[in-house]
Amino acid sequence: MKVVINDEYKNCKELVVFLESLDTRYRQKGRTLHLDRNAVRSFAITELGRDVVIKRYKKPLSVQRVVYSFFRKSKAERAYYNGLKLLELGIDTPTPIAYVEQKKAGLMEYCYFACEKTTHKSLEPLILQDKPLDDHLAMSLARFLIDLHTKGILHNDLNGGNILYYQDGDTNYH
């Protein structure tokens, strides 16, 4: 199993032990936040004093297992490094903590991405509702996407579940 941990978290022994045994602990502990193609769970890490959110990506199909094992970075690795890059560019995103890759017979089995838990909300419920998007929210979203583009970021998976926001007052969205 490959475990890559952000330098800021390497001294947290509880977290390191947890991540190194993630393949067995993931299903036994934590609180489910989302369960669909991928699973997202929240885990209390006492030593950190806060929760860590871990996304477990679905098991790749046979051909994908070969591709992710030898030719392409895993989704978890890309999420980790993309998150670090966003922070470096001043774009608010949950702090990446680690990624874990689990292989079987040398081929990718599962991969996990860990980040700090945030109080920001998913944009998805607002997009899926039957009424038009609030004008202030729509403008804030447009400004955010322009900011991403200006900084050289092309969001390749632009869906509401991948965009987090928080509201500051009645009309200020971030």
Residue locations for each model-derived region?
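Catalytic activation segment of kinase domains across protein kinase-like and atypical kinase folds
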Residues: 161-174
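AlphaC helix of the protein kinase catalytic domain
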Residues: 122-132
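Conserved alphaE helix
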Residues: 136-144
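A broadly conserved detector of short glycine/acidic/proline-rich loop/turn motifs that flank catalytic sites
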Residues: 9, 58, 169
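N-terminal presequences and immediately downstream first alpha-helices
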Residues: 1-21, 28
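Conserved ATP-binding subdomain of kinase catalytic cores across diverse folds
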Residues: 17-122, 146, 150-151, 155
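Alpha-helix N-cap and loop-to-helix initiation/capping positions
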Residues: 71-74, 132-136
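Hydrophobic HxD+1 residue recognition
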Residues: 158
